Amino acid sequence: MKCPRCGKQEIRVLESRSAEGGQSVRRRRECMSCGYRFTTYERIEFMPIMVIKRDGSRESFNRNKILQGVMRACQKTQVSVKQMEELVNEIEEKLQLEDVQEVTTLRIGEMVLERLQRLSEVAYVRFASVYRKFQGIKDFVTELEQLERLETHLRRDLERPLRNSPPSESESTASPDWVGGIPQLLDQNDTSSNLSEIPK
């Protein structure tokens, strides 16, 4: 390996360690001639994947291109560089495990959005605005509404086991309306009950 500064080949390794979740080895190197220090990464060589672009043309899968797009979307957010790299690693690993030879930019974009949604709403909307080519504020509002609906469904899925789980002994004693794990509504014939107080 040649020194990127002086071009000499007398290089020594100062430090080696696992990186990118075990997907690569990071090595810190030093040129013995000029003293310049630099970092290299050794990665597993996966089978090449071709990316089908919107216009039908094809190009080789480039993880750095995806990472740059994610970094732009995550500017001034709390998402760390490590989290961004892990996001791209996860996408690349998933595609390799699926043993696909071709993948569309549409599929890659959706995979990125799915993961950004868990990291940052701001980054999600930024990436979506470029990926889905927003034309105006209406597109942003539509995307935000869709994101809100998704989060609502996720919260309901997380809360459902809690609502359906049987009550503890103390809850059973304190709440006589609970029968068989299902809360009983007030008697519909009870005209004294306030309908606004019935949980919806």
Swiss-Prot record:
Signal peptide: none annotated. It comes from the Bacteria. Its cofactor is Zn(2+). InterPro entries: ATP-cone_dom, NrdR-like_N, RNR_NrdR-like. Binds 1 zinc ion. GO terms for biological process: negative regulation of DNA-templated transcription. PROSITE patterns: ATP_CONE (PS51161). Keywords: ATP-binding, DNA-binding, Metal-binding, Nucleotide-binding, Repressor, Transcription, Transcription regulation, Zinc, Zinc-finger. One of its GO terms (molecular function) is ATP binding. Residues 186-200 have a biased composition (Polar residues). A zinc finger (unnamed) spans 3-34. Residues 158-200 are annotated as: Disordered. Residues 49-139 form the ATP-cone domain. Negatively regulates transcription of bacterial ribonucleotide reductase nrd genes and operons by binding to NrdR-boxes. Belongs to the NrdR family. NCBIfam families: transcriptional regulator NrdR (TIGR00244). HAMAP family: NrdR. This is Transcriptional repressor NrdR.
